[in-house]
Amino acid sequence: MKHLVLASGNAGKLEELRAMLADLPLQIVAQGELGVDDVPETGLTFVENALIKARHASTVTGLPALADDSGLIVDALGGAPGLYSARYAGSPTDANANNAKLLEAMREIPAERRSARFYAVIVLLRHPEDPQPLIAEGSWEGVITTAPRGTGGFGYNPVFLDPVHGLTAAEMDTALKNRLSHRAVALATLQHKLHALSL
């Protein structure tokens, strides 16, 4: 496996994934660089959506493909925004609108009930018909702030606080965030599976 297509059109995700995969002996190519458009995410779970994206990119390019599907799960909101995190405030996706809607939904929720987690599923398809895709998941526990903090990252980063470090994901430097994040946990699990299979 010399080339790997990242099946995402999300610039923030692409930057994060490229940084996390930098040590692998692979040429990482974003799907857009190969003329692959985003595919509708019609799955009912994170795993289904990641598989849809990876299969689409692998089918179009003929290359192995890695896809992530992720979201923010807020306990007090019954798991919302969850699978619909990117489109929580409607389409087209708008991180500021999503954050504003989330903070409004959480306005009356006390501090002790503001628990949340980022959750990610990463899928690797070695070829379009791969019958045994490698699937890994990761989560990052935190709490929802009462106001945005920080300017780094993307998505819900300004409103997701890591209580251990006392920083939102948007306040962290890239190295710290890429060590703690749900995507980092999932990628570490995936890399372990790859080594176990000698890929």
Swiss-Prot record:
Catalysed reaction, written as an equation: XTP + H2O = XMP + diphosphate + H(+); dITP + H2O = dIMP + diphosphate + H(+); ITP + H2O = IMP + diphosphate + H(+)
Cofactor mode of binding and number, as noted: Binds 1 Mg(2+) ion per subunit.
Amino acids binding Mg(2+): D69
Residues at the active site: D69 (proton acceptor)
Binding site for substrate: S8, G9, N10, A11, G12, K13, S70, F154, G155, Y156, N157, K177, H182, R183
GO MF annotations, alphabetized: dITP diphosphatase activity; ITP diphosphatase activity; metal ion binding; nucleoside triphosphate diphosphatase activity; nucleotide binding; ribonucleoside triphosphate phosphatase activity; XTP diphosphatase activity
Matches recorded under InterPro entries: dITP/XTP_pyrophosphatase (IPR020922), ITPase-like_fam (IPR029001), RdgB/HAM1 (IPR002637)
EC identifiers of the protein: 3.6.1.66
GO biological process: nucleoside triphosphate catabolic process; nucleotide metabolic process; purine nucleoside triphosphate catabolic process
Recorded superkingdom: Bacteria
Keywords: Hydrolase, Magnesium, Metal-binding, Nucleotide metabolism, Nucleotide-binding
GO cellular component term, pick one: cytosol
Any Pfam family: Ham1p_like
Residues passing through the membrane, by range: none
Magnesium recorded as keyword: yes
Family per record: Belongs to the HAM1 NTPase family.
Xref: PANTHER family: INOSINE TRIPHOSPHATE PYROPHOSPHATASE (PTHR11067:SF9), INOSINE TRIPHOSPHATE PYROPHOSPHATASE/HAM1 PROTEIN (PTHR11067)
Quaternary structure and partners: Homodimer.
Function: Pyrophosphatase that catalyzes the hydrolysis of nucleoside triphosphates to their monophosphate derivatives, with a high preference for the non-canonical purine nucleotides XTP (xanthosine triphosphate), dITP (deoxyinosine triphosphate) and ITP. Seems to function as a house-cleaning enzyme that removes non-canonical purine nucleotides from the nucleotide pool, thus preventing their incorporation into DNA/RNA and avoiding chromosomal lesions.
Name of the featured protein: dITP/XTP pyrophosphatase
Source organism (scientific name): Xanthomonas campestris pv. campestris (strain ATCC 33913 / DSM 3586 / NCPPB 528 / LMG 568 / P 25)
Classification lineage: Bacteria, Pseudomonadati, Pseudomonadota, Gammaproteobacteria, Lysobacterales
